[in-house]
């Protein structure tokens, strides 16, 4: 396997909180997949949940080398946890098509958060 891309992102949690205070659920609706949205609505720390997912999706877009444009959208990247709790990434729509075109066979996700920040790194392999 070869590394195709590496992306990292850091998010200030207070910034996400401010956007939610200003615009309500709009950011969450734009960023989250349908499955993530259902979790977010009842999550005990919804701002932190959204900040972490935002960081992963930005990192993934950077790893793919595209950013969020040309048909790619945040909600086409879905963060979920495997049976051991490890964060994983599932792709939909144009993101899935791009991964198939690039020959992506594996994606690695690491995610961390502290009081003020959430950060993520995504590595994609062919």
From Swiss-Prot:
Cofactor: Mg(2+)
UniProt keyword list: Cytoplasm, Fatty acid biosynthesis, Fatty acid metabolism, Lipid biosynthesis, Lipid metabolism, Magnesium, Metal-binding, Transferase
GO MF, one annotated term: magnesium ion binding
Enzyme Commission code: 2.7.8.7
Location relative to the cell: Cytoplasm
rRNA-binding among keywords: no
Gene3D superfamilies noted in UniProt: 4'-phosphopantetheinyl transferase domain
InterPro entries: 4-PPantetheinyl_Trfase_dom, 4-PPantetheinyl_Trfase_dom_sf, ACPS, Ppantetheine-prot_Trfase_dom
GO cellular component terms, A-Z: cytoplasm
Binding site for Mg(2+): 9, 58
One BP annotation, GO: fatty acid biosynthetic process
Reactions catalysed: apo-[ACP] + CoA = holo-[ACP] + adenosine 3',5'-bisphosphate + H(+)
General function of this protein: Transfers the 4'-phosphopantetheine moiety from coenzyme A to a Ser of acyl-carrier-protein.
Family (UniProt): Belongs to the P-Pant transferase superfamily. AcpS family.
Identification of the protein by name: Holo-[acyl-carrier-protein] synthase
Species of origin: Escherichia coli O6:H1 (strain CFT073 / ATCC 700928 / UPEC)
